[in-house]
Amino acid sequence: MIKTILPGKTIGIIGGGQLGRMLAMSAKEMGYKIAVLDPSDSCCAKVFSDVFIQAEFNDFESVEKLCSACDVITFEFENIDAASLEKLEKKYNIVQSAEVLRTTQHRYYEKEFARKLDIPTVDYIYVEEDTNVEITKPYLMKTVRFGYDGKGQKKITSTEEVEPHTLLEEFVKLDKEISVVAVKDKNEVIIVAVVENEHKNNILYRSKVPTTATKDQESLAIEYTKRILSNFDYYGVLTVEFFISEGKVIFNEIAPRVHNSGHITMQSATKSQFRAHIEAICGLKVGKIDNKETTLYNILGQDLEYFIDVYKNNGGYLHLYEKEPRQDRKIGHINFYGDVILGGKHD
């Protein structure tokens, strides 16, 4: 049974990036205190923390120090040591379980989990040590661990290119990509938003609500997401990404946390993914969430000046993360009501 953690208590966040920052902002608005652990003394969530611990994520003693100072613990990304988390969750209030981390940290385990729940996936080949795999068509080779924004993956066409500890995924004809942002509270699974996503250079650059998927496709994606959450010991926001290919809904991956596509809910939804997550991990009722037509653009370091001009000339809702601009680094996002197309290099 999940504990009820009321405002005035302390929430610990493992990770001080933009997701941790926006979680902290929502929690502070609700009256919670915040403790953050991150390796960087200049991480963008630090400014919203009451307690800050500078330490590596695999520093068990420091993570336990964070846990001991907090009433509930959450994390902003999944690249945390699951074995350490498993030890800590026996003693502290960690509601995004180590079991979920262990599954979602490994692409093969994740795909197998989906298949066991009768959720369609692309065809794939798991390569452990032996790379002598017959390749008769192109595959997308992905490292089984620690990949994001297209990192750790490449197209291969021959056996000689196969590397150990990878997952080879069959290419499918991609009609569109959608994500289901859901939250599990003490009573039920609530859909925060269903979002359509467009990528450039493997980085999310535009999202929109509602999607152009059919009602049946959205309903199926929602059903699959609820099936996943009902089979996990987990509370909080969890996002599932899907491909729509030739009319079929195909599982891609799970993010056991708040998600980049869910930033759109800061304007689109009656309750943002960040507030919904805080309510859920604190044992509170989230309630029904509705959305209206909204468009999100991610802001990368090289595009900051462009989006500042867009904001000056067109308005919108600008969210900057106080991160140093660098090439392809996410430093903010901007939301607009309606289906907005900026044109030029951004569309």
Regions found by a protein language model. Name each.
Residues Q96-T159:
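A conserved helix-loop-beta module that forms one wall/lid of the active-site cleft
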Residues F60-A69, T131-I135, T159-E161:
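Short amphipathic alpha-helix with an adjacent loop that forms part of the alpha/beta core around
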Residues F48-E56, K91-V95, L168, G315-H319, ...:
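Active-site regions of enzymes building and remodeling cell-envelope glycoconjugates
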Residues M1-V100, T104-Q105:
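ATP-binding N-terminal substructure of ATP-dependent carboxylate-amine bond-forming enzymes
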Residues P7, E279-D347:
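Peripheral (often C-terminal) accessory segments that flank ATP-dependent C-N-forming ligase machineries
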